Amino acid sequence: CIRDSVKPETVKMFEGFGVFTEAELKSRAEIKYEAYSKAINIEAKTMIDMAGKEIIPAIISYTTELANSVLSVKEAGADASVQADILTEVSGYLKEMKAASAKLAETVATAATFEGKAQAEYFRDTVKVAMDELRAPVDKAEMIVDKEFWPFPSYSELLFEV
């Protein structure tokens, strides 16, 4: 949409009606690109912060308790395969989160090397993809991790309990 605002036919129309000049349209487009980049940058840095300071530590606590549960159940002579399977699954999500968080931090740092339209496109094409890659294992873990460990309200709590 921003890109279309500076197309020759759009510029001609706005200039023809005396609404905006080409320079004004280009200036407005640059401002919109900058605002978009700033918004995505804030969202990405917030995701990195939430993952690193809240979600990953919570999952580490949960997997530690789950591992202790597996050992206790085995010591009691019972089958701990379900707990062990959950531990393996959640540990896998934890590993994915750690890698995705590092990748997101790297892409955010790289985004700072661009400006204007190029930066906005980098945020759209690269940073948002990295954000989705972090969100995927977090969403999966949220469905499994005990709510006593989860640091934020779940989607269902937000949807049905507010």
Where is each model-derived feature located?
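C-terminal catalytic subdomain
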Residues: P8, F17-I86
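Surface-exposed polar/charged interaction patches
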Residues: F20, S69, A76, A100, ...
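Amphipathic alpha-helical coiled-coil segments with heptad-repeat character
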Residues: N41, K45, A80-Q83, L87, ...
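Long amphipathic alpha-helical coiled-coil segments
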Residues: A111-F123, D146-E161
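Structured alpha-helical bundle/scaffold domains in large eukaryotic membrane-trafficking regulators
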Residues: T63, A67-K74, A109, E142-P153
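Charged, amphipathic alpha-helical oligomerization/scaffolding segments
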Residues: M50, E54-S61, E65, E89-K103, ...
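Short, small-residue-biased leader/transition segments that mark boundaries at the very start
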Residues: C1-I2
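Extended, well-ordered alpha-helical scaffold/bundle regions in very large, multi-domain proteins
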Residues: E75-A112
